[in-house]
Amino acid sequence: MSTRTTRTYMAGRLLLVAGLGLASLTACAHISPSAAPELAYQVTEGQNINAFLRDGPVAAHLLLRNGQSPRILVAFPAGNSGVGLWFDQLAGSANWTLTQTPQPLTMRDSRGRPLYGLRATATIGAPRLAIRKAVLSNVRFLRDYESVGRIPDEILVPKRSDGGRLIFSRDRTDGAPGYMIEVRVTHGRLEDGSIIAGADGNIGIELTAASGETPLTGLSEGELLNERAAPDAAARHALAFLSYREKFMAGSWRFNTYFGRDTLMSVRLLMPALQPAAVEAGIGAVLARMNEAGEVAHEEGLSEFAILDRRKNGNAADDTLAADAPTLDFGMIDDDYMLAPVAAAYLLEYASTEQARAFLAQPVVSATRAGDHEPAGALLARNLRHVVMQARPFAERQNALSLIPIKAGRLTGQWRDSEEGLGRGRYAYDVNAALVPAALEATGRLLHAGLLDPYLSPAERGELSGAA
């Protein structure tokens, strides 16, 4: 599934029944034993055959595109990375058949560093496949190539032929372990860099793809869902593929990454069906990406996207960050006022007092500063102070100009994330009429419960005391 609505869609289905440059690669690659992977399923959607796989350090989404413009794409939640092959236009439509489902593998690059990926076999009824472009990088660049046909020069990768194989591989631009995709022809032949069909008009390939980005830690189904969750296998599988201890993803293949609004809405909708560990993973991901002002990050840029973004724009906000640290976008304002209601619902309605206190005391490691951490309670309190500060002008002077506007210089700032979404307006109704009142009410509830007392000075408590 390819849109950011995937997780919210899964929430509805679950709750309905619940009652709510690599110079070369080493030849040796380790294929996981024949035991079934922890998660493996397929979804055919329109012209796309999608095969999802997760097993230990491997998480990958293989997409085979049918039609006159075939392509192969593998997306990895690790680093929101991916590899893709786009082929020249065909005279007629051609269809892929996945003849062997993806198997997880761990391999080594030429410097002995691990890459995590998959191997699968497929056939396609086409007389010839000529590779138009290979893109190996962060998925944002794969999306760019898909939509506008351009990528940065820094990530261009040459094609290499070796017998019956076509190989594309490279290190990341900072020299870290990178990406690879290899096509071995199993039926037909290679000719001048193109794959020519056999006498029966079919092409057969073995595909290997891998990424060197740091693996994420998947949440098992037992850690993710409780007994109230619907017995909907498709929804469970999709949710599991998108759920990790480090964060929840918005959707695959295009959005295997964090979005603040998507995370908070999904956690709240799914809360009746989620295990505490899953709720805490979602809220924790938001806290880990909060800025010093208490604002919630809308989106993150990862791995090679972050590296190239910094090379182009520099660390305008902080030049002490690592070159490959995530870049965080704080342009949206609606998610700032979603955190308090979601956190209050969990801490006051679903978790026991002991669970709530334990969660708030847990250290949350910063997503951008390796080794930096603060208690979850301190981070949540920071957001509540931001909410109250932003709401104070309207409390003191109840007129239109005291409402909370979208940020200066922007045409977007909430879920209607398009330049015409607010009709060129500055004051979003949902933010001011629904989200801010909900955030203030949640602040008052949390303050009254005393859960945040260890994380507030007397002055800060006084700041928040008039919230509700």
Segments and roles (model prediction):
Residues 2-22, 28-235, 243-247, 251-257, ...:
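Terminal accessory carbohydrate-recognition/targeting modules of carbohydrate-active enzymes
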Residues 218-239, 295-304, 392-409:
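An acidic intrinsically disordered interaction segment
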Residues 226-230, 235, 355-365, 454-463:
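C-terminal/domain-terminus segments
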Residues 293, 362-373, 411-416, 460-467:
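Eukaryote-specific, cytoplasm-facing alpha-helical/coiled-coil scaffolding segments in long proteins
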Residues 297-299, 388, 398-401, 418-419, ...:
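Catalytic cores of carbohydrate-active enzymes
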Residues 376-422:
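Secondary-shell segments that build the walls of catalytic and ion/ligand-binding clefts
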